[in-house]
């Protein structure tokens, strides 16, 4: 189950999180801003996904991960950089400059199936 900090109120997210843990499910808390990241720290047993896609404009910017990462560096669970990773160099930059080693890559893989440049890093 994924809990988007932009879409749910705090109490609803907490209830969904608690219920998922009771059912032995993993939870990904998705954040888009520093404020959402600070709020997500309460979900200690979750994975936290930093979504690089602006939900209002649908534009992606990997700098979102860099902007938010420092807030989450002490989170005990895995961090994920989500969306907008288009090249091998971007993936390596994210990996080398943050503690993040988990990435959600979709659109770029589908658009670049023949080139396989990003696959060589994975």
Predicted regions and their residues:
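Catalytic cores of alpha/beta
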Residues: 34-43, 85-101
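C-terminal helical cap(s) of enzyme catalytic domains, especially alpha/beta-barrels
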Residues: 67-71, 111-122
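Glycine-enriched alpha-helix->loop->beta-strand junction motifs that scaffold or abut catalytic
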Residues: 21-25, 42-50, 74-76, 95-103
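Single conserved hydrophobic/aromatic residue that forms the stacking wall/gate
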Residues: 1-7, 11
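Alpha-helix-loop-beta-strand connector modules within alpha/beta enzyme cores
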Residues: 14-28, 64-77
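Glycine-rich beta-to-alpha transition loops that act as phosphate-gripper elements at the mouths
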Residues: 29-34, 78-89, 108
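Short, small-residue-enriched loops and turns at beta-alpha junctions
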Residues: 8-9, 35-38, 54-60, 87, ...
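Glycine/Thr-rich beta-alpha phosphate-binding loop at enzyme active sites
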Residues: 41-70
